[in-house]
Amino acid sequence: MKTKLYFLTPLLLFALSACNSDDPSSSETDVPAAKERQDIPLTRSETQLADHTLDFSLALLRQASLQEAGKNMLVSPLGTAALLNLMANGAESHTADELYAVLSPSGVSAGELNDFFSKLNTWLPELDNTTSLAQAYSLWMDDQFTVHSGYTDVAQSVLGADVRQLDFQNTQSQQQLYDWCSEKTEGCIREIDCPLADAQLVMLHTLYFKGAWTDKFDPAQTRTETFRGNLREVAVPMMHDRQRAGYAATESFTAVSLPYGNEAYSMLLVLPAAGTDMAQAGRALADGAWKELTSRLYGAQVDLKLPKFTTEVEQPLNEVIAGLGAPTMFKPGADFSKLADGNMFVSKMFQKAKIEVSEEGTKAAAVTAAIMTMSAYE
């Protein structure tokens, strides 16, 4: 039976091989009527960047699925790309070349890339007044460490980053990072695995999303059923509905698009053919299946069965990003000379993400982090 689902949006990519059955709390209140959707006005270079960001998202899914085969996988491409761009602003030479090759098509400048992420930060929350979407950036420096003012000026003025200085040897400092993450994700993510003792700088990006389905599921139709994943079977609350939705099918995948609010945002549910594992599906989606599915979507009456669940995943990213073509920043000898003096490199990059899917809609959050350390490399 085909029961493995892939949830794909521009903000989050989620592969569900076996889901948690925690019942997400529902404290929904009345929401205003959805305003008419408006698309984001993009320049020619920004349109190129939007297309490239989609390609990056699918490549990230492919690379992460290789690393996390057989496990629940939840990753935010937007959060990952946004933090990589923040790092790229401090990089030089080969380190910068690799980062910009991953993030943007040739011919797009660093300034245009910054403007693109700044525009997303401004416009994405405005697309739907019934949907909440918020991003935030921050830089956390040890009080014995100095960052070049030119770098912090860009981080603050263009990307709106908070800049904080702390005593990283003080055990209370870590709690301040936790509190910031919790505040920016509306309490969804309260802690991250971010040791400070050997760090000089921590970069953070947060993403928070909360959207109500355009057509909600009836809670009276939710009942416990068996969900068959890659490795095990679990009993989950299964939501049921028959509604008009975007639908597409190929020999390899079936897809349904479920919109939120005024339909500016939607969740694409992708069901691979029987016998397809996560790595195979991730590779196929990145190699053209995703674009084929979305181009084939048409309105149809669909009988839906969707698990109601909450799950949280912390995803290491060092090997994933290196596999995408930017390995140098993780090695002593990386060049972050636009950021600070000394031999800085990224000792750990990771993302913690959480998603709740219920009859009302979806709540999701991601914290993407990079811990930067001084090396003795000469």
Question: Model segments located where?
Answer:
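Extracytoplasmic/secreted cell-surface and envelope-processing proteins
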Residues: 93-99, 276-279, 313-315, 365
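Non-catalytic, conformational "gating/processing" segments within enzyme and secreted inhibitor domains
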Residues: 70, 110-273, 295-376
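Ser/Thr-centric signal marking residues that sit
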Residues: 3, 95, 368
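Sec-dependent bacterial lipoprotein signal peptides
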Residues: 1-17
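Short Gly/aromatic-enriched secondary-structure transition segments
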Residues: 99-103, 217-226, 279-288
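Disordered, low-complexity tails and leader-like regions
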Residues: 12-15, 24-27, 355
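Soluble, non-membrane globular domain cores that form compact, hydrophobic packing
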Residues: 20-22, 145, 258, 277, ...
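Detector for small/aliphatic-rich hydrophobic stretches
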Residues: 6-7, 19-168
